[in-house]
Every structure is written in structure tokens, then in C-alpha cells.
Amino acid sequence: MSAEVKVTGQNQEQFLLLAKSAKGAALATLIHQVLEAPGVYVFGELLDMPNVRELAESDFASTFRLLTVFAYGTYADYLAEARNLPPLTEAQKNKLRHLSVVTLAAKVKCIPYAVLLEALALRNVRQLEDLVIEAVYADVLRGSLDQRNQRLEVDYSIGRDIQRQDLSAIARTLQEWCVGCEVVLSGIEEQVSRANQHKEQQLGLKQQIESEVANLKKTIKVTTAAAAAATSQDPEQHLTELREPAPGTNQRQPSKKASKGKGLRGSAKIWSKSN
């Protein structure tokens, strides 16, 4: 596995400055250096240069075509045209394979090993995993190798150069995304409105309960004060009423005792005469 590299624009800027004044064979050589340079994975600015486009109609048309394959294509595209394109160095092969993984990751985030092995023309899983680890170290993608399920799970990947014919599809995708955002926003606003209504209802109910509690407290307070006032007007009279029994009760009790006594004395007298 090669040393760790990071995707930066520093090397690319240097190549762009050199390419502005280069032509012919010198420019073709510079393009091959760009394709091999670590950390350079976008080539759109280089392709847009007029002197680079002139290569398409020159003896170095194959170099220009190779540059377009690195910008927009995959390793399978290169193999399909390999007879008409310059040979690749090992570093160029790995870079184009990295870009091919990025293209696959743009379509699906869980890529089976079998798909990768075929797309990258690799012989075994060990080579595939080494290539993916190298791409991760280069910050081309982030993810994990699921060896149990034999697949690559991609969390992030860099963007690739965009062709002009792809702009309409991108605009359509963005338009659909905007429509989806509007639908989500409308749903959120509706939920917020319902939440505010529920909040107002609960506040009204709370105020009503607090008002009823306050009125109840006032009623209890007034009733208690009135009872206390009534008790404190003549406390001695109130105590007397509690201590003295009712007049009707006192009159009935002695009469009962008297009748019982007379009955006993009368019966005694009758018993004496019989004796």
C-alpha cells in the first residue's frame, strides 16, 4: 500500500499554472504527470483550457481522450478503449480505480465485493481491500469494509467532474429536492400551528382552573371568617348552652324515678298484709 496522501488543491494549482503555457508534447507529458500525481482527482479546469482542447485534434488526441476518461469515466471505460489509449502506470491504474469506486458510491452506498472486483478488474479480495484502504487514506472516500457480508459500506465520497450533458439532470434533481423541502416545510409549519393551538388551549384551561381555585379559596375564607365571627359574639352564652341540659329532659327524668319508687312501696305494702 502506498504512503498516505490527502486530496488538496495545491498540486493541482501548480499543474494548472504550468499547463497554461505548455503545448504539444510538453503539454501531453504534463497531463500524464497530472494523472499520476497523488491527491489530484479532478480535471475539469484542465480540460477547459483552450490549449488542452487543441490536443483533441493533434497527434496527442489519445492523451486528451485519456484525460477525459479520468475526468468522467471508469476503469472499465479505459479497458474498453485500451488499444487506442496510452498505457497506464500502476499509480494511474489505482487512481482510476479509486475514481471508479466513487462513481459506484454515487449510485449505491453498499457495494458488494463481487461488483467491485468486476468493475476494477481485480483478482482477489485482498487486492480489493488494499485498494479501498488506500482510497480511504487518500481521503477519496470514507466507509468500512464489511468482511462478513462481503461488501463496502460508503459513508462519504468526493465529487467528480461534471459533463455539460449532465447539467440538466442535476438541475432536475435539485428541483425535485426543492419541492421535497417545501413539502417538509409545509408539514412542519402545520405541526407548529397545531402545537400553538394546543398550547393556547392548555393555557386557557390552566387560567380557568386557577380562577376557580382562587374563588374557592375566597369562599372558604369568607365562610371561616363568618363562623369565627358568630362564635366570638357571646362566648359565655355559647358555653352555657353547651353545659346545661335541655329543660324538657330535666323534667321527665325525676317523674320516672318517682313512679318507680311508688310502685315499689305499694307492692311492699300488699305483701305485708298477706302475711
From Swiss-Prot:
Keyword Transport attached: no
Biased composition (Basic residues): 254-263
GO cellular component terms given for this protein: COP9 signalosome; cytoplasm; cytosol; nucleoplasm; nucleus
UniProt PTM comment: Phosphorylated by CK2 and PKD kinases.
Segments traversing the membrane: none
Modified residues (N-acetylserine): S2
SMART domains linked: PINT
Subcellular location, record wording: Cytoplasm; Nucleus
Keywords of the record: Acetylation, Coiled coil, Cytoplasm, Host-virus interaction, Nucleus, Phosphoprotein, Signalosome
Coiled-coil residues: 185-233
Principal location class: cytoplasm
Domain (PCI) ranges: 2-159
Tissue: Widely expressed. Expressed at high level in brain, heart and skeletal muscle.
Residue ranges of the region described as Disordered: 227-275
InterPro entries: COPS7/eIF3m, CSN7_helixI, PCI_dom
GO biological process, one term: protein neddylation
Family recorded in the similarity comment: Belongs to the CSN7/EIF3M family. CSN7 subfamily.
Role description: Component of the COP9 signalosome complex (CSN), a complex involved in various cellular and developmental processes. The CSN complex is an essential regulator of the ubiquitin (Ubl) conjugation pathway by mediating the deneddylation of the cullin subunits of SCF-type E3 ligase complexes, leading to decrease the Ubl ligase activity of SCF-type complexes such as SCF, CSA or DDB2. The complex is also involved in phosphorylation of p53/TP53, JUN, I-kappa-B-alpha/NFKBIA, ITPK1 and IRF8/ICSBP, possibly via its association with CK2 and PKD kinases.
Protein name: COP9 signalosome complex subunit 7a
Species name: Homo sapiens
Gene: COPS7A
